């Protein structure tokens, strides 16, 4: 952690939010991806993050610790003419909650913007402190 701790903390939040946005974009892009019956259906990617504890109890930001797949069963849609239909005529749809992804998209976007606001405010505070010394 540098002397510009608030910048580092906010930057970690922005990185986590960007990873979250990337995962959401990937999930939305694959909302209609269908795979052959012998392959697992697409599952939404979930970003797993944890708080980074600081020695002084304040904390040092956030870290992405992994990407997991969403739980749940794929929706079975009867479409015997689809090339990926199983022997019973069912196609397994992706495990992606589009409405949930859109809600997460708004939250991730707001989180990213808030962290960038902290970066800007911290930078302005440091610049003001430097001007005092002149």
Per-region residue spans from a language model:
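Amphipathic alpha-helical polymerization modules
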Residues: 1-134
């Amino acid at each position: 952690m540098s002397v510009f701790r608030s910048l580092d903390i906010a930057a970690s939040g922005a990185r986590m939010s960007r990873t979250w946005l990337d995962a959401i974009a990937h999930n939305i892009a694959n909302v209609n991806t269908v795979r052959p019956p012998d392959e697992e259906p697409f599952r939404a990617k979930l970003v797993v993050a944890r708080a980074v504890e600081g020695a002084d109890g304040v904390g040092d930001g956030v870290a992405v610790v992994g990407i997991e797949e969403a739980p749940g069963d794929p929706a079975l849609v009867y479409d015997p003419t689809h090339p990926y239909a199983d022997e019973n005529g069912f196609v397994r749809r992706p495990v992606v909650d589009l409405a949930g992804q859109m809600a997460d998209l708004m939250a991730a976007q707001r989180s990213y913007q808030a962290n960038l606001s902290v970066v800007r405010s911290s930078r302005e505070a440091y610049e003001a402190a430097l001007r005092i010394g002149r």
